Amino acid sequence: MKKIAVFKQMPCEAADAPPAKTDLLPLSWPAKLELGYQRVKMRTVPVLRRHQGPLRVQKHLYPEGPAVCQHMILHPPGGIAGGDTLDIQIHAGSHAWAQLTSPGAAKWYRSEVSLARQNLALSTEPGGILEWLPQETIFFAGCQTALDTTIDLAEDAKVIAWDIIALGRPASGERFNSGRIYQRFRLRRNGRLLWSERMQLLGGSRLLESPIGFAGYPVAGTLLASGELNDQQLTACRSLPIEGGRGGLSQLPGLVVARFLGEETEAARNWFIALWQELRPALLGRSVSIPRIWNT
């Protein structure tokens, strides 16, 4: 019987969920982005692009040829303040392949009262493929933030997605000693839950230093990839060097999960890219083409 390595979920602060939207102060700057993709013959074509407020995408690109459509998501203000909301919905039709990334870090600023929110929903039809590969997210000390991510996969659909977070600004000596982060992440296939995680982290919490929490590291990351690796592929992934931190990779039923803890976002990004270079051909059947924006 094939052994399955179990990598435990990071513990989270026991606390109530964030207040309902009706309890919040009036929203200061709502933004919404809807993207949809369809496969037309051998080409993935963007068929829906709707936005409201300061969320945009650049012109779609085909650096790998017509099968994979690449979009870069832009948030021109450069940061999210208290009361702001970001609502992002991305859908890949049957056998469409969309890759989404960003030009720079997402920054969540200090807020005295109002909660800032992001709702991200990724979904596919049968055979669709989504790659969600953003740059890191920086939580400034004093931020009040709630992030809710859902991924809904249809039969035979595939996804690779990662999330890299930085608590405070470690390069400037700023620690996450105040504020609150509420984060929920769910991944389902055909309505069946494959992955669910909730975290509420309070600034200055003991979890920041605890060996069963962040262990004193200011940077954390999670990578999810649908599918299952064979023993040789698992060995190749686990043999990749991790510099500037520590990490692990587990094969769960129908899902590969990688975790990172470290000092710098660059270390997390480098390891995740190295994993992506192994996982993409193994699970998606196509070698990696590095987005040009990552080299600038």
UniProtKB/Swiss-Prot annotation:
It is found in: Cytoplasm. Disulfide bonds: none annotated. It comes from the Bacteria. The keyword Chaperone applies. One of its GO terms (molecular function) is nickel cation binding. InterPro entries: UreD. One of its GO terms (cellular component) is cytoplasm. The keyword Glycoprotein does not apply. Keywords: Chaperone, Cytoplasm, Nickel insertion. It holds the Pfam family UreD. UreD, UreF and UreG form a complex that acts as a GTP-hydrolysis-dependent molecular chaperone, activating the urease apoprotein by helping to assemble the nickel containing metallocenter of UreC. The UreE protein probably delivers the nickel. HAMAP family: UreD. Belongs to the UreD family. PANTHER family: UREASE ACCESSORY PROTEIN D. Required for maturation of urease via the functional incorporation of the urease nickel metallocenter. This is Urease accessory protein UreD. It comes from Nitrosococcus oceani (strain ATCC 19707 / BCRC 17464 / JCM 30415 / NCIMB 11848 / C-107).
